[in-house]
Regions:
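Right-hand nucleic-acid polymerase module
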Residues: 1-99, 108-218
Length: 218
């Protein structure tokens, strides 16, 4: 008897296809909710964010549990330098299956981090190479090139709307990894992002000028 002509087999096959389609839709919807929630949390706390950090491993770490343990150890070291240290991280998988972390964080908000503390931060990540492993980019300040009135360039504090745009871009950048590695989340059965406690969950922007500036960036 041909399987393709057997009504029972056809019905069973259609049921399997329907369940699979439903599972894919559920995973897609779940990923969208996670992306929205994470982006909201990043944007809601825009005032405290000062730096964007990427942490990479010297070896190809495929054990996500081990990678997260090392990340946790790193956050403890950061809290020793910055007692009010706050963060949100996202995991990204390399093509070979290894992991690294993208972190938006708060170091001494409202202040410029001293060279001494900056060097201490560089020594907090022990699992990279001697010359790399931790890449740090500032969020609060922008580089102003030298002009007629200045012989050299300098760092200037960003205006509120400039920082909001920066945080918006960083939020989109971070959440893009959740979308890219959605299947990896399903396979490993582990959250691909996390944060410190005490962060705001959502915020509503009502200032027409800020809304207009943000809309122009979309």
């Amino acid at each position: 008897i041909s399987v393709t002509n057997n009504p029972e087999h056809i019905a069973e096959l259609n049921e399997i296809k329907a369940r699979y389609a439903l599972e894919l839709k559920s995973r897609e919807d779940n990923t969208k909710r996670k992306i929205t929630a994470l982006r909201d949390k990043i944007q809601s706390n825009y005032e405290i964010w000062t730096h964007f950090i990427t942490l990479t491993f010297k070896e190809n770490v495929v054990d996500l549990k081990l990678a997260k343990e090392r990340l946790k150890d790193w956050t403890k070291k950061m809290k020793l330098i910055f007692p009010e240290f706050q963060y949100i991280y996202v995991v990204e998988f390399h093509e070979k299956g290894g992991t690294h972390f993208h972190v938006i964080c708060s170091m001494d908000p409202g202040k410029m981090v001293s060279n001494k503390k900056f060097n201490e931060v560089r020594r907090t990540w022990n699992w990279g190479t001697n010359t790399s492993g931790i890449d740090i980019k500032g969020i609060n300040y922008k580089y102003v090139p030298k002009s007629k009135d200045s012989d050299k360039g300098e760092l200037a504090l960003k205006k509120a709307d400039e920082k909001i745009k920066t945080i918006w871009s960083v939020g989109n950048y971070l959440t893009s990894y959740l979308k890219k590695d959605a299947n990896a989340t399903f396979l490993f059965g582990s959250k691909m992002y996390g944060s410190s406690t005490g962060l705001k969950k959502s915020i509503e922007i009502t200032d027409p000028k800020k809304i207009a500036n943000l809309e122009r960036e979309l």
